[in-house]
A protein has these predicted regions:
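Conserved alpha-helical substructure of the radical SAM core
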Residues: 1-100, 112-114
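Radical SAM enzyme [4Fe-4S]-AdoMet core and its adjacent flexible, acidic
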Residues: 29, 49, 72-75, 91, ...
Length: 182
């Protein structure tokens, strides 16, 4: 398998309007559960994808899980709503297993009580620091059909922070605008 999704928690710190949520009992995976699953999954993939219904950065053992993943030879891809990055950035960036982060910028608008500028600043600062360590960061903005009134502002902020030549949206139908490689 190219990657295997592993839900380390189904608990999220937000209640996004576009998310179906879950009715399952709230759960944070234990060290033992993670180690067991990592051992079972090892023969099948090199990539674990911390993603699904919960917010992985809300898990108090995220650093331990990244260390366990590294010890077993995994590379980790993590999807986050970005709101907790200022609190967990040092833990994430110290983890050799972290290969890529996908930051869902559409989470901002689907919630209230989040300061727009602080939120974007935290996500952008993390991506800058991650890139200095060779960690890939992808900004996701896919809230078509949902709350997307600030997409233009978000794209403008991305252009300001990450200057350079950008490819037009038409170059990637149904995908976010991307900076031109190189």
């Amino acid at each position: 398998f190219a990657k295997i999704y592993l839900e380390i928690t189904n608990v999220c710190n937000l209640a996004c309007s576009f998310c179906a949520g879950t009715t399952r009992k709230k759960h944070f995976m234990t060290r033992e559960e993670f180690a067991f699953l990592a051992d079972r999954l090892r023969p099948y993939t090199d990539f674990l994808y911390f993603h699904l219904m919960g917010e992985p950065t809300a898990h108090p053992l995220i650093g331990d899980f990244l260390a366990t993943a590294h010890a077993r030879g995994f590379r980790v891809i993590l999807t986050t709503n970005g709101t907790l990055l200022p609190k967990v950035a040092d833990t994430l960036l110290a983890a050799p297993a972290l290969f890529k982060t996908s930051l869902s910028l559409h989470a901002f608008e689907a919630n209230s009580g989040i300061d727009f500028e602080s939120y974007l600043q935290g996500c952008f600062d993390f991506a800058d620091r991650a890139s200095q360590q060779g960690i890939i960061s992808v900004f996701r903005l896919w809230n078509d059909g949902g709350k997307n009134g600030r997409n233009t502002e978000i794209l403008h902020a991305l252009h300001e922070r990450f200057s350079g030549e950008w490819m037009p949206e038409e170059a990637y139908p149904a995908k976010a605008v991307r900076p031109r490689p190189g």
